[in-house]
């Protein structure tokens, strides 16, 4: 809401615009009239001439708007504080308004301070609440019963409980025994081949001895 002086200025601007609009309507929409009875009435096909009834109604409407606006201006002028009021009364009223303004400013400062205090209290409560939750979670995670539960879970995880785990363990044992058997067979084959080679070498020595014994020089 604006003050009365601003309202008065706006009303003066509006009434000036209405005066200009009225003059423009009269200039653009009036009919042609001769200066005397001897001159013929002139016409212009490009002009936007209003009929006598339209012209009269337009003038009435524009005049009514101007009258209403002038009454508003008069009312605002009569309501101005300087009209019919002495200088002492005006100064007293100004002092009273200044005191009210100071009181309102103090209330504003007090409300802002109270708001800041409430915000700080809320922040402290949130900090305490979050810290309590964190401490409770930390204490729960470090409790002895929880450690024992974790160990039990690990032991249960190491022992196969499902049929698939048991079958997998049996298959692994079979594979290990098969690999061990193949390794032993390879060792046995190597020892047999070494024995056969030694027998062949011994047979060759015997053959040499026999050939020497039956040589022509000894016969």
Swiss-Prot record:
Query: Which GO cellular component terms, listed alphabetically, does the Swiss-Prot or TrEMBL entry include?
Result: mediator complex
Q: Which Gene3D superfamilies match?
A: Mediator complex, subunit Med21
Please provide the record's keywords in A-Z order: Activator, Coiled coil, Nucleus, Transcription, Transcription regulation
Q: Where is the composition biased (Polar residues)?
A: 210-219
Name the Pfam families on file. Med21
A GO biological process held by the record: regulation of transcription by RNA polymerase II
List where Basic and acidic residues composition bias occurs: 166-181, 191-204
Which segments does the entry list as coiled coil? Answer: 86-125
A molecular function (GO) held by this record is: transcription coregulator activity
Q: Where are the transmembrane segments?
A: none
Q: Does the keyword Coiled coil apply?
A: yes
Q: Where in the cell is it found?
A: Nucleus
Cystine connections? none
The keyword Transcription regulation belongs to this UniProt entry's keyword annotation: yes
Q: What's the family?
A: Belongs to the Mediator complex subunit 21 family.
Q: How does it assemble?
A: Component of the Mediator complex.
Q: Which PANTHER family has this protein been placed in?
A: MEDIATOR OF RNA POLYMERASE II TRANSCRIPTION SUBUNIT 21 (PTHR13381:SF0), RNA POLYMERASE II HOLOENZYME COMPONENT SRB7 (PTHR13381)
What biological function has been recorded for the protein in this entry? Component of the Mediator complex, a coactivator involved in the regulated transcription of nearly all RNA polymerase II-dependent genes. Mediator functions as a bridge to convey information from gene-specific regulatory proteins to the basal RNA polymerase II transcription machinery. Mediator is recruited to promoters by direct interactions with regulatory proteins and serves as a scaffold for the assembly of a functional preinitiation complex with RNA polymerase II and the general transcription factors.
> Which protein, by its recorded name, is this?
Mediator of RNA polymerase II transcription subunit 21
* Naturally occurring in which organism (per UniProt): Candida glabrata (strain ATCC 2001 / BCRC 20586 / JCM 3761 / NBRC 0622 / NRRL Y-65 / CBS 138)
Q: Taxonomically, what lineage is the organism?
A: Eukaryota, Fungi, Dikarya, Ascomycota, Saccharomycotina
């Amino acid at each position: 809401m604006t003050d009365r002086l601003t309202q008065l200025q706006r009303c003066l601007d509006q009434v000036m615009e209405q005066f200009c609009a009225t003059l423009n309507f009269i200039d653009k929409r009036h009919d042609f009239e001769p200066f005397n009875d001897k001159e013929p009435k002139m016409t212009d096909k490009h002009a936007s001439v209003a009929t006598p009834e339209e012209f009269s109604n337009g003038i009435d409407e524009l005049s009514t708007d101007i009258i209403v606006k002038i009454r508003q201006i008069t009312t605002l002028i009569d309501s101005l504080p300087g009209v019919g009021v002495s200088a002492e009364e005006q100064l007293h009223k100004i002092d009273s308004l200044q005191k009210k303004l100071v009181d309102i400013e103090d209330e504003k400062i007090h409300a802002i301070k109270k708001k800041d205090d409430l915000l700080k209290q809320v922040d402290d409560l949130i900090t305490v609440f979050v810290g309590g939750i964190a401490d409770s979670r930390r204490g729960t995670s470090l409790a002895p019963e929880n450690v024992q539960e974790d160990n039990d879970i690990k032991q249960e995880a190491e022992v196969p409980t499902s049929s698939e785990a048991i079958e997998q363990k049996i298959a692994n044992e079979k594979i290990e025994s098969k690999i061990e058997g193949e390794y032993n067979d390879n060792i046995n084959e190597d020892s047999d081949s070494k024995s056969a080679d030694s027998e062949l070498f011994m047979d060759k020595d015997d053959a040499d001895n026999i050939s020497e014994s039956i040589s022509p020089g000894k016969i």
